Amino acid sequence: MDRHRVAIIIPTLNESNTIANIVQSVLPSGRVIVVDDGSTDNSAQLASNAGAEVVRHKTNLGYDKAIDSGFAYASDLGCKIAITIDGDGQHDTSLIEKFLSEIN
């Protein structure tokens, strides 16, 4: 699977404690798109430094709008597969590769 056609969308709000590690752990699987939903910390900068493409909302628009923004951005990039995970570290990121191998 061409990793440039896979988008991993991570909506985030003030996740500076976890976002860099999450981005780094999923980066080999696809294009990482972090949607910063109005964070007041440095989540967006940390995500960018870790290798993510960052979409920023100036204010908190809510989880659903963050997901929508991520899907729109991924579509504009030509991604054919989109996977969402949360920015707080609650998901097992190793399952992304397993999922991709199953659909390939």
Located regions from the model:
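Structured catalytic core of nucleotide-sugar glycosyltransferases
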Residues: 1-104
